[in-house]
Amino acid sequence: MLKNSQKYVKKIDASSVYDVVIRSPITLAENLSLSFRNKIFLKREDLQPTHSFKIRGAYNKIKNLVRKDAVSHVVTASAGNHAQGVAYSAKALKIKATIFMPKTTPSIKVEEVKKMKSKVTLIGDNFDEALDAALKYCKKNKLPFIHPFDDSEVI
């Protein structure tokens, strides 16, 4: 088990995500540490360009697809941080992205994705309905789907 973990850490360290993300610091959370009488540290992924760790997985997956399969258009479904990660990654790699988001997605998330020049399709009342529409769109147009969580290259 440890050997596999070490291989995985090496794979992460060699990842090309550092083309677009920072090596975010780990900082002591003083008030939390005092409250819980223990040292509590925070990994500052809020300092990433999209203010979330989700950009790491999105960029890793898309960069691998561009490199291996020369894709020029990707699709995802998300109501938030993954959508922003895919949009940012697509823009950085100069490819198209279509993002399916539930109609209930906060407007600030929709606007952030649009700012990155991705096409946004608001559909359905929840994530599952947006996901279903995205998968149908991928099948019809023969495009790769970037799953927000069910893909080892995204985790």
Show the residue positions of the predicted features:
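PLP-dependent amino-acid enzyme catalytic core
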Residues: 1-155
